[in-house]
């Protein structure tokens, strides 16, 4: 039986989020609705999640001493990483010492903090199908890897980055140097290591939200949400929709792959498993042990959205992955480089049938920064996609 205390009391159930962007913000809201005391941590002040949490803390999360000191001072029941750029060795040590519990596990946080750990686990340990790949530490190694078998076209990514930063496709030798420089500029930390992947000729890519939660008998069960289709530009999510139609054989294979990798990572919570699909063939791409940006569509498509599923699962509560309606999401971009922007056209956006919006409250806007998302539900995915895109296009951030 799960017992939850009263926030801001000696018996409070305390959860600390490491990373407090738009996804963390929604997790914090879901936790608070269940009576949890929340601590939002980020590298800068006034991050979206810090605006709604009981407590806000700002530290360099890649500094193991700062991270340990904060966790030892706050003594949260659970520590929930929401980003990759964290001093994971400190989390592993604190978990081993019994200071706190890391979600889903400290090992999972370490393996998924960069593309190398999770790719080696999936391809080399679990034997899951992936694109051909090499890891490189220099432009010379990258060139040799491509010429030595990866070939063109190929995709280059920093081993540690988020939201598509530093990711590019190379169609020929003339693009190699520029791709290397772009990858270096997009890395989340001072790391010169990249992954180069052979291009998979897929029909589409999906996110399969996979939930590990306790069932009625107390044992951990794996459940799957309906597949989420998404469109990316330069590796960054632009729109997503649910459900994405798939042949039964491909869907079963996708669930087998997602189940295998999340079972090995262990723990409880939601995982965003990214997969390439061509006909009945499925390839593993990446996994995040947390809610996924493409999964924001679940705020209008599921009875329990991905943030509520994560909150429930980590607290040991029952989950329900049932789809209630087809729907879509579309990104609202900053459009300007400015602090403290205002948003025009919110009323116009909400006049589009069956739509809603989320503005993330980011303190600073950039031209291509994700500042919000439009959501729409409809009788079919195509209508929902059109309506979400229309609503997003009516919102205009403006510098003041």
Swiss-Prot record:
Residues the record lists as binding ATP: 115, 157, 162-167, 197-200, 205
Pathway assigned to this chain's UniProt record: Purine metabolism; IMP biosynthesis via de novo pathway; N(2)-formyl-N(1)-(5-phospho-D-ribosyl)glycinamide from N(1)-(5-phospho-D-ribosyl)glycinamide (formate route): step 1/1
Disulphides: none
EC number in record: 6.3.1.21
PROSITE patterns documented for this protein: ATP_GRASP
Keywords: ATP-binding, Ligase, Magnesium, Metal-binding, Nucleotide-binding, Purine biosynthesis
Reaction it catalyzes: N(1)-(5-phospho-beta-D-ribosyl)glycinamide + formate + ATP = N(2)-formyl-N(1)-(5-phospho-beta-D-ribosyl)glycinamide + ADP + phosphate + H(+)
Molecular function via GO: ATP binding; magnesium ion binding; phosphoribosylglycinamide formyltransferase 2 activity; phosphoribosylglycinamide formyltransferase activity
Annotated InterPro entries: ATP-grasp, ATP-grasp_carboxylate-amine, ATP_grasp_subdomain_1, PreATP-grasp_dom_sf, PurT, PurT/PurK_preATP-grasp, PurT_C, Rudment_hybrid_motif
Domain ATP-grasp residues, every copy: 120-315
Binding, N(1)-(5-phospho-beta-D-ribosyl)glycinamide: 22-23, 82, 293, 362, 369-370
Enzyme class: ligase
Annotated GO CC locations: cytosol
GO terms under biological process: 'de novo' IMP biosynthetic process
Family that this chain belongs to: Belongs to the PurK/PurT family.
Function: Involved in the de novo purine biosynthesis. Catalyzes the transfer of formate to 5-phospho-ribosyl-glycinamide (GAR), producing 5-phospho-ribosyl-N-formylglycinamide (FGAR). Formate is provided by PurU via hydrolysis of 10-formyl-tetrahydrofolate.
Description of how the protein assembles with itself and partners: Homodimer.
Name of the protein described by the UniProt record: Formate-dependent phosphoribosylglycinamide formyltransferase
């Amino acid at each position: 039986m799960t017992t939850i205390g009263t926030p801001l009391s000696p018996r409070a159930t305390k959860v600390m989020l490491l990373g407090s962007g738009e996804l963390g913000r929604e997790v914090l809201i879901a936790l608070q609705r269940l009576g949890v005391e929340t601590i939002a941590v980020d590298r800068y002040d006034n991050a979206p999640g810090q605006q709604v949490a009981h407590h806000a803390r700002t530290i360099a999360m890649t500094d193991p001493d700062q991270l340990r000191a904060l966790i030892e001072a706050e003594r949260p029941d659970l520590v929930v990483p929401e980003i990759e750029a964290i001093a994971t060795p400190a989390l592993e040590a604190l978990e081993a010492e019994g200071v706190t519990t890391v979600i889903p596990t400290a090992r999972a946080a370490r393996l998924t903090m960069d593309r190398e750990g999770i790719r080696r686990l999936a391809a080399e340990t679990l034997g899951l199908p992936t694109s051909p790949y090499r890891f490189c530490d220099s432009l010379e190694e990258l060139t040799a890897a491509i010429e030595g078998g990866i070939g063109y076209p190929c995709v280059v990514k920093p081993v540690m980055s988020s939201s598509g930063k530093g990711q590019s496709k190379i169609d020929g030798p003339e693009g190699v140097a520029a791709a290397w420089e772009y990858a270096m500029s997009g890395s989340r930390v001072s790391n010169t290591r990249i992954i180069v992947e052979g291009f998979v000729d897929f029909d589409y890519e999906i996110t399969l939200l996979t939930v590990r939660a306790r069932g009625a008998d107390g044992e951990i069960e794996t459940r799957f949400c309906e597949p989420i289709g998404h469109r990316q530009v330069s590796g960054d999510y632009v729109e997503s929709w649910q459900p994405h139609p798939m042949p039964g054989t491909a869907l079963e294979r996708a669930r087998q792959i997602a189940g295998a990798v999340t079972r090995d990572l262990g723990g409880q919570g939601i995982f965003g498993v990214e997969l390439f699909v061509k006909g009945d063939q499925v390839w593993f791409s990446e996994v995040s042990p947390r809610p996924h940006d493409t999964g924001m569509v679940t705020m209008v498509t599921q009875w329990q959205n991905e943030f509520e599923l994560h909150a429930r699962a980590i607290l040991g509560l029952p989950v329900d992955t049932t789809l209630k309606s087809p729907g879509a999401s579309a990104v609202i971009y900053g459009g300007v480089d400015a602090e403290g922007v205002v948003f025009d056209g919110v009323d116009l956006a909400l006049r589009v049938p069956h739509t809603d919006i989320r503005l993330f409250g980011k303190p600073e806007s950039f031209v291509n920064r994700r500042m919000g998302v439009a959501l729409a539900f409809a009788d079919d995915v195509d209508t929902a996609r059109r309506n979400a895109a229309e609503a997003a296009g009516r919102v205009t951030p403006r510098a003041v």
